[in-house]
Amino acid sequence: MTLVQVKDKEFYLDDFLKQRLDNLKDIVYKKNWDGVFIIDGLERVGKSTLGLSCAYYLSDGNFTVKNVCADGDDAIRKIESFPDKSVLLIDEGSLIFNSRDAMKKEQKKLIKILNVVGQKNMIFIIVLPSFFDLAKSIALRRSKFLLHCYTDNSLVRGRFAYFGEDAKKILYGVGKKNYDSYEYPKRSLNELGRFTDFNPLGEEYFETKRQSLHSALHEDERIKKTDLALRMILHVDKYVFPIPFNKKMRREMLGIDERTYTKYLELATTGGVLATTLS
């Protein structure tokens, strides 16, 4: 490992990882590309710590709690306001509390976010529990590499495995068929690294994570309430009436104008209400 100094802080970086991060800095800052990569691992293995270390190094120390995105909506706001070639980190650990529908909705936001990241030549770090939960377009096509965090047999934190672009493709295909296994393709000794407990943001970062988790815990509840409200407004059970009711008849019966009705239909397709509600 190499002792690096960034501004007034010193911390250790794995030699192989430092090379990969230096390559990423060159791609973004000198060649005007974007740099997206993924860090995953089970809960409490240290993936957020590794993410902060990478972000702080890549930004040359210009990384604060404002560069951390609590969720997709927060990321959209920050990407629009931050200058080109900024470093942002989104910690999606909260996804473990979300339903499958909520996760799909969040990933649709991520895809849109990554399009803007590319236009603004940003570095964007995605931290989440499992690489296999990501859509293929994010996991394979829009990310440079994966750092998978894990512990040793004694549950000691601070280890990661590196998967480059080609290795990610094999991992995604084979691993998904084997209960999300990370065993294949095998990693060389260089691609198995260590990291230290370095958190440049201190308690501020943990407060941001708590807010993200709180939002995720209440997300399903909010969706259920919205779903119920829209069902009451729009859903007409066809078996109650002797004839089927089309969309125009529903609008007229409920006294809802076409614009409002269209808005609710849009919610149905974007996750605000179940798609079956208005079928």
Model-identified regions with their sequence ranges:
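N-terminal pre-Walker A segment at the start of P-loop NTPase domains
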Residues: 1-28
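Glycine-rich phosphate-binding P-loop
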Residues: 36-59
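Post-Walker A helix-loop "phosphate-sensing" segment adjacent to the P-loop in P-loop NTPases
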Residues: 56-68
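Conserved nucleotide-sensing/catalytic segment adjacent to the nucleotide-binding pocket
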Residues: 68-126
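A short helix-turn-beta junction within AAA+ P-loop NTPase domains corresponding to the substrate/partner-engaging
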Residues: 137-157
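Phosphate-binding and hydrolysis-coupling loops of NTP-dependent motor/remodeling domains
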Residues: 152-224
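Short, amphipathic alpha-helical "recognition" segments used to contact nucleic acids or chromatin
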Residues: 221-244, 265, 270-272
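Short coil turns linking two alpha-helices in DNA-binding domains
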Residues: 257-260
